Amino acid sequence: MSYTYKDNTDEVLSALEKAKKRGLEAIGLVAEGHAKKLTPVDTGRLRNSISHATDYEAAYIGTNVEYAPYVELGARGRDGKHMLQRAATEHTDEYKRLMEDSMKNA
């Protein structure tokens, strides 16, 4: 009696890596949306500048507007709005679900 085995390890690892990338992208998009909803608006420049990026391990949200740290963290007696921090930390269950869904569909 003879058995033949096929090693699918590379295909499985590739599918998992793609699923992780999809999950991180979904998390980044959703986190960006949450941050934009929390951002105070005067001209809309700060809100419109918020974007996301991903790498192999994480999703990031941020902005390149020079006055963003003052709105986020506060300055001169003004309380910070913490819109980026809150977008990242107040929705962890949702982000976990997004990653789980992505991995289930791998």
Give, region by region, the residue ranges found by the protein language model.
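Short, Lys/Arg-rich flexible segments
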Residues: 1-106
